[in-house]
């Protein structure tokens, strides 16, 4: 029996003027009170960028104008049932998100300083020298 893959997308925003990254504090039953990124499940026939834009509108209140967007990573679960696409987006300056019910806080954090507790899936993404 073949199973379909659930695809999701997330975006890691970086402010050029402050050299800090945006993290959101999760408010959901899976991994509650952990720091993560804006993002979520890709719906219907959305492209990755369309899903990323929609998720930002839902979770941040708008899609920030980015200067550069780079695909950072595609994580696929061992059973191939889940794939998460992470993008890096640089913005000129920090912004204040209008959070929806999925998050209870946000923080812009300096490079190399990690918010705790971090969502377990995010740690492997951000913990490498290329970023």
Positions of predicted regions on the chain:
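Conserved Nudix-box catalytic region and its N-terminal flanking loop in Nudix hydrolases
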Residues: 17-59
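Conserved N-terminal beta-strand and adjoining loop/helix that marks the start
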Residues: 1-22
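Active-site-adjacent beta-strand/loop module that shapes the phosphate/pyrophosphate-binding cleft
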Residues: 6, 17, 73-97, 101-113, ...
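Short, structurally constrained coil/turn elements
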Residues: 31, 63-65, 102
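Short strand-loop junctions, especially beta-strand C-caps/beta-turns
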Residues: 40, 111-112, 117
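A short coil-to-beta-strand element that immediately follows conserved catalytic motifs
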Residues: 63-73
